[in-house]
Swiss-Prot record:
Keyword NAD included in the entry's annotation: no
Low complexity bias spans: 130-161
The protein's name: Fibronectin type III domain-containing protein 1
Domain of life according to the entry: Eukaryota
Gene3D superfamilies, per the entry: Immunoglobulins
Signal peptide location: 1-19
Transmembrane feature ranges: none
Species of origin: Margaritifera margaritifera (Freshwater pearl mussel)
Length: 754
């Protein structure tokens, strides 16, 4: 172990308990200088050779002068303690003598006055000795002046513990004897009371003989009471007497740290003062001792112990320098009062950090591939115990790759790199104390690589909006394939792309395509930086779908006495092939629904006659070979109309010689004036199986008409209605026009019924 030791305000140094060295400032001692400094202090070595030691001699002499007074005071306290012990012994002897005489007195050989006088005098002597012993004990427990015994005498510091320990031992012996005397006295008083009962004692029976010695018994009782009082005082004094020296509490919050700088390790220890009754213990009598020794990892000492004493209680830190790196040491801090009384302390084991390595040497390139290279190096000259190497590979873009490897290795290959890319390589070594500087940089460029084309590209599935492709991987090359890219287009003027990041995946589904549309596909293998050669083109057509809804739907109500609706529209945005039909579903809300098919080339439709003052629902569909698409839905409410009832309507079917079938319709006179009549008729083969046809008769007095029909055996439905024209023909038409969000409103057409 190296022996550089630095302690702030070092007062005493005990290498293996072979002496003391005192100073008042920073002390640095190494190896043989310890013995040389000791010789200088003893006067055997010239002080001129050791100027620092000479300064310490002068300081030690000055402090020794101040300490002589403390020695004298300590001697006086010691004498007081000894005197107290002697008095206590005398009191004990007096008690013992009184007890002997008391025994003789009880036998009638000693006068009673002398017996009680010996007892009282012995008790008072013990009490006085106890008071002296207490003063001596307190002086030895916390000696304010006697603490500074001669630390520096004629240039050398001598131990000042033997005198104090002797005093404490003597005091402890005296206190033990004192306790025995008090117990003996109390026992003797109790026995004497039992011999001479008094009226104050329970179960006492008076007798003539007792009354004969009344004066004597009162005298005995009074003296026994006096001895009891003195004994109780002795007990009180004995409680306050300490049984021995009381150590101070240990230092608080002891912290030990270590570092290694420039191939040398240091240990730093700090602490807080001990506390007594909530206050820190300080003062000139409070010192600290730091115990330091090399140890193993379990805290067991493996070398000699060094003890350092810090005289100034205001300094609560110390350092031990120039130690071996990566080594274990034990540190313990204790507080001392008056040099002889020392607190308990807990030993702390600390391991000094290892050396910080120097940079690795001779970094060089061993070989390259498109996605890898290998490097080698020499270990650092200063390395201690290495924990790992760290290799840094930085691209031109600044992106860095870091790899940590085993410290036993001196070469390594980095993989998964970009092809055709320059990297800057550095390496650093680490111990458990930190990382070395990085080595000199080495520039390395990986080989270039272009992948071959994927093989056997094919479409394995499709639907309305997607196509699924599959292919075989390219033939192996020197580099790594990172994934694939699929380009697809409609007309080669522009293309979309799909990326696959996993090179093991050789199938993909391209989505969000248009139904019934031809697409062209090409697959590429790719690296991190470039595409490889493209595969052959393949074409695939998505499946057809039903058309989307018709666009720009416009509708309006037409009214010439009978209300209708007219609807117009534009073809769907996506027809997915030719439109076969347009289909309209319509009817009174809550009633039967009619279905009409329209030719794909006519983009308008006029409804049959509508019910007055009723809601009608409409749905318009487009249809192709796949099926019927989504509808456009809308609703219309017709206007209210006055109802003119025509009574007695009769229908008669007649067939002429030429096989012409006609319906003769007659009716009665309405109750209100009319301008004419409407006669409506249609075939009745089911609900809404045919459209209404009508005849307008603009004669208010007409009472019948004839309708020619083409189908002889088909039933017909006939309705007769009266109507009254409006006074202003220009307002005869009432129309409503509607459109839908995103659709254009068509222009209003003229009313064909006016």
């Amino acid at each position: 172990m190296k022996s550089w030791i630095s302690i702030s305000f070092l007062c005493m140094l005990f290498p293996l308990s072979n002496g003391q060295l005192g100073s008042s400032g920073q002390v640095t001692l190494q190896g043989a200088q310890i013995s040389q400094a000791t010789q200088s202090l003893q006067g055997t070595a010239p002080t001129s050779q050791y100027p620092q030691g000479g300064t310490q001699i002068s300081q030690g002499g000055a402090q020794a002068t101040q300490n002589y007074q403390g020695v004298a005071q300590g001697t006086q306290i010691s004498q007081g303690l000894t005197q107290g012990a002697q008095i206590s012994q005398g009191g004990g002897q007096g008690i013992s003598q009184g007890a002997t005489q008391g025994t003789q007195f009880s036998q009638g050989t000693v006068p009673s006055g002398q017996f009680f006088q010996n007892i009282v005098q012995g008790t008072q002597a013990v009490l006085s000795g106890a008071q002296h012993s207490q003063a001596g004990a307190q002086g030895s427990q916390f000696p304010q002046s006697a603490a500074h015994t001669a630390q520096h005498h004629q240039g050398t510091a001598q131990p000042a513990q033997s005198g104090t320990h002797a005093i404490l031992k003597e005091m402890e012996k005296s206190l033990a004897e004192f306790k025995a005397y008090v117990e003996y006295l109390e026992n003797m008083v109790y026995k004497e009371r039992m011999k001479y009962p008094s009226p104050y004692i329970q179960n006492f029976t008076a007798s003539p003989s007792n009354f004969t010695y009344t004066t004597f018994e009162n005298d005995v009782d009074m003296r026994l009471s006096s001895m009891e009082r003195i004994s109780s005082e002795l007990v009180k004094q004995m409680v306050n007497c300490p049984r021995g020296p009381v150590p101070p509490p240990p230092p608080q919050s002891v912290m030990v740290q270590s570092d290694t700088v420039d191939n040398s390790s240091n240990i730093y220890v700090s602490w807080d003062p001990p506390y007594f009754e909530g206050k820190p213990l300080t003062g000139e009598n409070m010192h600290y001792k730091v115990y330091f020794s090399p140890s193993d990892q379990y805290g067991k000492a493996t070398g000699g112990e060094f003890i350092f004493r810090i005289c100034d209680a205001n300094f609560t830190q110390a350092s031990v320098t120039d130690l071996n790196p990566r080594s274990f040491y034990s540190i313990q801090v204790a507080a001392t009062l008056c040099e002889a009384i020392e607190s308990e302390g807990t030993s702390t084991s600390v391991k000094t950090p290892d050396l910080i390595p120097s940079a690795p040497l001779n970094l060089k390139l061993e070989g390259t591939k498109p996605n890898a290279f290998a490097v080698s190096w020499d270990p650092p000259t200063v390395k201690g115990t290495l924990t790992n190497y760290t290799i840094y590979a930085t691209e031109e873009s600044g992106k860095a790759t870091m790899v940590t490897i085993d410290p036993k290795l001196t070469s390594y290959a980095l993989y998964n790199l970009y092809e055709g890319t320059m990297y800057t390589i550095r390496i650093a070594a680490s111990s458990d104390n930190g990382m070395s500087p990085k080595s000199e940089p080495l520039e390395v460029t990986t080989d270039k690589f272009i992948p071959m084309a994927p093989r056997n590209v094919r479409a394995i599935d499709n639907n309305l909006t997607s196509v699924t492709l599959e292919w075989d991987a390219p033939l192996p090359g020197r580099g790594m394939i990172r994934g694939y890219r699929i380009n697809y287009t409609l007309d080669f003027t522009d293309y979309e792309e799909m990326l696959i990041s996993d090179p093991s995946i050789t199938t993909a589904t391209i989505t969000n395509l248009t139904p019934a549309t031809e697409y062209y596909f090409q697959v590429f293998a790719r690296t991190m930086k470039r595409l490889g050669y493209g595969s052959h083109l393949i074409m695939n057509k998505t499946k057809m779908d039903v058309p989307s809804e018709p666009m720009s739907v416009v509708h309006r109500i037409m009214d010439n006495g009978l209300q209708r609706i007219q609807v117009s529209w534009q073809p769907p945005e996506n027809t997915y092939g030719p439109i076969i039909d347009y289909i309209i579903h319509w009817g009174v809300r809550g009633g039967a629904t009619r279905k009409e098919f329209l030719t794909p080339y006519v983009l308008s439709w006029t409804s049959d006659f509508l019910d007055d003052n009723a809601n009608h629902d409409f749905k318009l569909f487009a249809q192709n070979v796949v099926g019927i698409g989504k509808p456009v839905a809308f609703s219309v409410k017709t206007l209210p109309k006055p109802q003119i009832l025509v009574p007695n309507v009769r229908v008669k079917r007649e067939t002429s010689k030429n096989n012409i079938t006609s319906l003769t319709v007659t009716w009665g006179s309405p109750k209100v004036p009319v301008d004419g009549f409407f006669v409506l008729y249609r075939k009745y083969e089911g609900v809404y199986s045919d459209r209404w046809k009508f005849i307008e008769i603009p004669k208010p007095n007409a009472r019948g008409t004839t309708i020619t029909v083409t189908q002889e055996n088909v039933p017909y439905v006939v309705v007769c209605k009266g109507f009254k024209r409006q006074k202003k023909p220009t307002s005869n038409l009432s129309s409503q026009q509607f459109s839908f969000p995103g659709q254009q409103v068509g222009q209003q057409q003229s009313n064909p019924w006016i």
